[in-house]
């Protein structure tokens, strides 16, 4: 059982209780619903959070991904509705809110959901220029992080990234992914990343924490099948660049010592440390 699965199973009882009280307050705004009905709905929401996860651990399916997506959307909506009901409660302590104001506040959540989903499925390229004296020529790097391939964003996100990288092939020389290529919500199968195989620039990847949840060996195998260069506490030289991939370390996964990292750096090149999280730099 993966770390993510254990974490979700531990949280499900609390999640069900949270759902019950959230739904109870929301329905009270409209006159109320019998508690038995709310208990059943809350339990079903809790089951939807954990049951598809067991199937997705073994083999990702369309049905499993659908329920995981619904769960993810509802979990986000629940947090937004919580903010809504707290705001409504506070305002009602001072004034009596007209019903139409309550309806507007609640309607903001699905509107925001549609807007955020639209933005989350778009790939936007932002540019930043860094200047160094010891570069022979301009090098454009595509930097990505937290792709989170999984049940919610499955092969379509890989296809999107592949198409975007192909668009950038004439202007960019290398792509770097700094962790969480997978999110651990579904098993990564050997050919899941093969959509990136046809990209005509090197793709470098260093694991983040989520990449370990369903088995880092599965993520590495899928990367290798797609021609992705995996840097697991290792370095890769490209033109005037020396890229060192510092793998995310936790539990029994040790962090390389400062001396080990320094020995992998090249004073004659531009050194880039590819690391998932911005801490431990001291």
What residue spans do the PLM features occupy?
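Soluble catalytic domains of enzymes that build or remodel membrane lipids, polysaccharides, and related
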Residues: 131-282
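Hydrophobic alpha-helical transmembrane segments in integral membrane proteins
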Residues: 110-133, 151-156
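Context-gated lysine
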Residues: 6, 24, 59, 99, ...
């Amino acid at each position: 059982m993966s770390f993510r699965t254990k974490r979700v199973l531990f949280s499900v009882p609390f999640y069900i209780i949270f759902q019950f009280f959230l739904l109870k307050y929301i329905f009270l705004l409209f006159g109320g619903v019998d508690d038995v009905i709310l208990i059943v709905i809350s339990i079903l929401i809790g089951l939807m959070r954990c049951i598809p996860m067991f199937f997705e651990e073994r083999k990702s399916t369309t049905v499993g991904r659908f329920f995981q997506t619904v769960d993810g959307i509802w979990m986000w909506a629940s947090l937004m509705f919580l903010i809504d009901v707290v705001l409504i409660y506070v305002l009602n302590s001072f004034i009596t809110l007209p019903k139409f104001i309550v309806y507007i506040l609640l309607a903001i959540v699905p509107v925001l959901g549609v807007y955020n989903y639209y933005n989350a499925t778009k790939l936007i390229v932002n540019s930043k220029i860094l200047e160094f004296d010891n570069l022979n020529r301009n090098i454009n790097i595509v930097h990505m992080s937290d792709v989170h391939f999984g049940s919610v964003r499955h092969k379509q996100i890989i296809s999107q990234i592949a198409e975007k990288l192909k668009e950038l092939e004439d202007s960019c020389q290398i792509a770097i992914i700094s962790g969480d290529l997978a999110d651990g919500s579904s098993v990564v199968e050997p050919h899941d990343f093969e959509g990136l195989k046809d990209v005509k620039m090197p793709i470098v990847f260093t694991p983040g924490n989520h990449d370990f949840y369903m088995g880092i060996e599965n993520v590495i195998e899928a990367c290798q099948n797609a021609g992705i260069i995996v840097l697991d506490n290792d370095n890769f030289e490209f033109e005037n660049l020396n890229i060192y991939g510092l793998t995310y370390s936790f539990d029994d996964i040790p962090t390389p010592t400062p001396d080990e990292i320094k020995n992998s750096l090249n004073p004659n090149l531009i050194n880039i440390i590819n690391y998932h999280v911005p801490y431990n730099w001291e």
